[in-house]
Structure formats: C-alpha cells, structure tokens
Amino acid sequence: MILQAKNISKRYGNHLAVDNIQLQFKRGTFNAILGPNGAGKSTTISMLIGLKQPTQGEIIYEPGTKIGVVFQTSVLDEMLTVRENLTIRARQYKGLKPNRVSDLIDRLGLSAFQKQKYGTLSGGQKRRVDIARALLHGPDLLFLDEPTTGLDIQTRKSIWDLLYQLQREEGMTVVLTTHYLDEADEADQIYIVDHGEVIAQGSALDIKSQYAKNILKIRFKERQQIESLKSLGMSVEQQSQLEYIFQPKSEREAIDYLAQVRDRIAHFEFRPGTMDDAFIALTGREVR
C-alpha cells in the first residue's frame, strides 16, 4: 500500500469530526472519498497530507512517496500569469527538467492562456492550472479536494477526462474527495463517509450492486396475476392495472426475464442502480 490510515480520528473539543477511519490506497489506483458536506472528507484529506494531526491513529506512507495536492481554494497568485505562477513554484523543487513547466502547459492545454493573469481565468481554466502546479514535481500520489466544485457539467467532464488520462500515463495514485457521485463511477476504490465514519467501501460496481436497486418497469398487454410474477423470484410491485415494477439483481436477470415474457409486453423501461441510489440507501438522504 502506498498509503494507509489506521484508526484515525479527529476531535475538536466535544465534536468528533472523524471517527476511527481506516483507509488503504494501492499504488497506481484511483480512489474516491464520497460524502455530504460536513461528513469529514476535507478533515480526512487534511490529516492524510499532514496539514492536521490526528487526535488518535496512525498514517503510514511508503518511504520516499512524493505527494501533490489540489486544494479547494487555490494557492496561486492572481496577479501573476499562468507561466509566472508555475515557474516560481517549479523553483521550489530540486532536479526538475528545464522544460517541465512548458511540458505541463502543453499537456494540460494551458498554452492559449499561459500569458494571462491567473485571476482573470475561468473556473475550469484555473482548475487546470492548479492541477499543473500539483504535478510539477511528478508526484506518486495526487490528492484532489473537491476539485470540480462550482464548475458546469461540460467543464467538470473535461477536467475528469484530463485526470483519468494523466493517471494512466503517469501511473499515479489518485485520491479525491467529492460530493458529485458520478465522478467516482470509474474509481477502483470508494469510501463513503458520513458523520465522520466510513459507512461503505468497495469499487463503484460493488457498492451499486450491494446498495442500489435496479428498476425494471413493464407494461403488459393484459392484466397479470401478481402471484405468478412473484414466483419468478424477483421483487415486484403493481403500479396500475397493466404496469408492474420489478427489482432485478442484475442486467442479466432483467434480460432473461424480458425474454421469458416478451410476447406479453407492450412496453418496458430498465434503469440500472446508480451511485445516487446507493448513497440515499446508505445515508437516508440525497447528497448535499
């Protein structure tokens, strides 16, 4: 493991912000910490990167691990240009290649606005520059704390396409916090946190299959005997005289059932379970 957090907690007076959390991140994987605002995500990240000390517990890195961090709030100078900001930051690291700044400007698509002052950039442009700053020294482990908060859907997608590409090319380990549940769909490992505790963990597929319900809605040509439908082993609920809602455990089960009753079907809809469904099932509320 490139990083392990063993039974870490953080207390502020009588308030327990993080409660006995255990995390493990394998080298080269994409990891997500999900949860509503106030769940303890940012406090956890702050402990992992050393900005805050745990009240109890232990954080263990592989020896020699280099980390990069994209903070919620930028640490760059708004009055300097993109290139000036990156050049000044690059001087803080020893042994960087002379063309490192230019290389990142090209790879992250910053060329068109590299001479603009950072403070004049759009939200998406600033995020790209923030990511470039975090990558200057070639980190083994990249932390991103709510990196796309406040950005529109198209900009969020472009940022995530970039991050997935960089993660594959660089072989980095990535750890992000977010309350946009769709951003974790490709993650190798997800930790869902609420009230400072890990309430579920696993791959996106594992969590969705365990906590999210698939919905198969069928309108039959004629009224059906609900007992005969229940005998097939799926949960079923009658919505109207001809409409029934089933909860197949998998897409395969839905397809097999549709094949069995295809001659009786007037119309059907299938909606696979989502991370939003899983989150609501786990926390009892939508992410906020």
Predicted regions: what they are:
Residues L162-I245:
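ABC transporter nucleotide-binding domain
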Residues L216-R288:
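Short, charged/small-residue-rich alpha-helical element at the C-terminal edge
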Residues T87, P98-F113:
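Conserved ABC ATPase "signature" region
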Residues K117-L121:
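Conserved ABC ATPase signature
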Residues I49:
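Helix-to-loop junction immediately C-terminal to a conserved catalytic motif
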Residues L142-D145:
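Catalytic Walker B motif of ABC-type/P-loop ATPase nucleotide-binding domains
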